[in-house]
Amino acid sequence: TGTDLILVARRRERLEALAADLSARYRVGTEVFPADLSVDEDLNSVARKIAQTPELDLLINNAGFGGHGQFHLDEKGEADQMIKVHVVATTILTRAALRAMMARRQGAIINVASVAAFSPLSGTMYSSTKAFELMFSENLQTELYDSGIKVQALCPGLTHTEFHERAGLNLSAVPEIFWMSAEEVVRISLRALRGYKVIIVPGNINKIMT
């Protein structure tokens, strides 16, 4: 058997389908928790759930918000939503998980940042908020150096998921050599938790880019 999971995302139907698949394939317990982390009420509900789960071993902050518009032309509040999802939610959920982890002197937190954290060319708000996730992770690990808790900033590059399509980005012309599968990125991230390196950039192409 594997590790029991609490799955958080906006779409209940997708969550329930994923939970059923994971339960059947790996014989793990799954709980779905539909929430939009850009909404205060939902974010606070997730934080309470985390705080009420003292046996939590691993928190993965992987909620993403993509955008490609120019900052000075943003009239839809995309910048505010990006800050809410990448900065505010990451901070609040990490704090919610830490109390129990500190008491047990064990646990791990993976903040999914991006190679965009190293680049000024990936959009003003996207690069900036991803840079926050990177620096937050690095400084937090320093703060927790003797706590038994590991903090990782995972900085993937182009990864085959729905993210780019949902963000309205057509990257079909980008050669396959620049892409990685989500499974490959996950394997590298979890393997890295055996050590103590905070910033993890998966893939040789991505390492060159940073």
What are these regions (language model features)?
Residues 3-17:
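Conserved glycine-rich Rossmann-like NAD(P)H-binding loop of the short-chain dehydrogenase/reductase
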Residues 24-39:
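Rossmann-fold cofactor-recognition segment
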Residues 62-67:
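Conserved NAD(P)H cofactor-binding loop of Rossmann-fold oxidoreductase domains
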Residues 70-83:
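Substrate-binding pocket helix/loop in short-chain dehydrogenase/reductase
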Residues 94, 129:
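Active-site helix of classical SDR
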Residues 114:
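Residue(s) in the substrate-gating loop at a strand-loop-helix junction
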Residues 141-205:
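SDR active-site lid
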